């Protein structure tokens, strides 16, 4: 296993030293040094999966930073009892799309065979000199890790797999609106791209004996917010019963010809749609395009949530506080609690307000923090300043 003995550099913008794991309920928290003030854990292990926080590294240029990030994540994997061969899913956040090739070359050095699934998008990062951030989900040693390759599709020449199956769970790569069988475009119409994405997802899931009905979580990256409504019209047609939990953000992709990339997680088993009550206790209302949360087994996948109101319209801290209150009501409705959170992603429209968001975040989550990434993107709400999406495990 390729691991350099480096200090972890993450979103706290300081060097951190890992210390032994702590246990909280059904999750194992991989802790940093107690002197760290970071409101996220390096990793959280729960069930068969290990959730690793978004991680940065210092260095000159994309290649040096990408190696530093992957070495840092390798140290966290080692502390969790795993290594690179157990990684199932990676999300790569690049400051500049021009750094894609350099990042890709380094990534391939670490994942030379049976690589994980991967999503790569352009976002803002918390540190001005940071060029790349990566977060991961890994599979505990001893649990199944099977690469999914649809029949008739050419083997991927890029360092990622189309799908990874572990037990009842499938992680899909970020899927684009093209015909993967022939590696050809389906045109620039957003609805055609959306339909192509779900046809591709259907074929990947079929290899595992699963279908779109098993999808529980969806992260949607769209390049132009004016396309959101048309995308939704095509999207909702694929989930007539229980739509997955979802977050949708504006982000640039690695190819200018594409307007949409979607990352999915599917879990076989009986699903329960969670509809949270309103703040005043009245019944909540279902959305045709997403579930507030989806419960399957001992896991809960929550949609990205916002906290926009007349009082918080220009207040990032206020929006974060209201968002986390909404998340709390959603957890309660599902029979979960804050301590069950294992993984999250925070989308901010202005990364200079990262500290303001964290004030509210620490009020709601006071210890045994979930793993977390925090990046800068556009949101679908014109007044939205922060959106937060979580996974919980009991």
Stretch-by-stretch model annotation:
Residues 7-17:
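Bacterial N-terminal signal peptides
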Residues 19-89, 94-199, 203-217, 222-342, ...:
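N-terminal presequence-like segments and the immediate start of the first folded domain
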Residues 1-6:
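Positively charged n-region of N-terminal signal peptides that target proteins for export
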């Amino acid at each position: 296993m390729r691991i350099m003995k480096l200090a972890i550099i993450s979103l706290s913008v300081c060097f951190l030293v890992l210390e032994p794991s702590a246990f909280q309920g059904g999750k194992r928290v991989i802790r940093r040094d107690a002197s760290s003030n970071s409101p996220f854990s390096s990793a959280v292990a729960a069930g068969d999966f290990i959730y690793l926080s978004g991680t940065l590294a210092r260095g000159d240029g994309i290649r040096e930073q990408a190696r530093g990030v992957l070495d840092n994540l390798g140290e966290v994997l080692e502390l969790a009892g795993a290594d690179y061969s157990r990684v199932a899913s990676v999300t790569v956040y690049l400051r500049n799309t021009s750094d894609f090739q350099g990042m890709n070359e380094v990534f391939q050095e670490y994942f030379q065979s049976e690589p994980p699934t991967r999503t790569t998008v352009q976002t803002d990062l918390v540190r001005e000199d940071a060029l790349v951030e990566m977060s991961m989900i890994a599979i505990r040693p001893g649990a199944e890790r099977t690469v999914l390759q649809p029949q008739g599709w050419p083997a991927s020449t890029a360092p990622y797999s189309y799908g990874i199956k572990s037990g009842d769970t499938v992680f899909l790569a970020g899927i684009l609106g093209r015909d993967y069988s022939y590696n050809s475009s389906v045109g620039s119409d957003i609805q055609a791209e959306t339909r192509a994405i779900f046809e591709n997802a259907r074929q990947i899931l079929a290899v595992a004996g699963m279908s779109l009905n098993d999808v529980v979580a969806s992260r949607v990256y769209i390049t132009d917010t004016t396309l959101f409504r048309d995308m939704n019209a095509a999207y909702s047609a694929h989930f007539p019963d229980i739509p997955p939990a979802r977050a949708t953000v504006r982000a640039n992709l690695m190819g200018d010809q594409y307007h949409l990339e979607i990352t999915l997680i599917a879990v076989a088993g009986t699903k329960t749609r969670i509809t949270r009550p309103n703040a005043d206790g009245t019944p909540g209302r279902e959305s045709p395009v997403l579930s507030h949360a989806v419960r399957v087994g001992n896991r809960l996948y929550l949609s990205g949530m916002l906290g926009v109101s007349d009082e918080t319209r220009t207040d990032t801290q206020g929006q974060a506080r209201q968002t986390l209150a909404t998340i709390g009501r959603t957890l309660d409705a599902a029979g979960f609690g804050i301590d069950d959170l294992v993984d999250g992603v925070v989308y901010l429209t202005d990364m200079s307000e990262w500290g303001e968001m964290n004030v509210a975040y620490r009020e709601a989550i006071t210890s045994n923090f979930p793993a977390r990434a925090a990046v800068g993107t556009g949101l679908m709400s014109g007044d939205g300043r922060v959106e937060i999406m979580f996974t919980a495990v009991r």
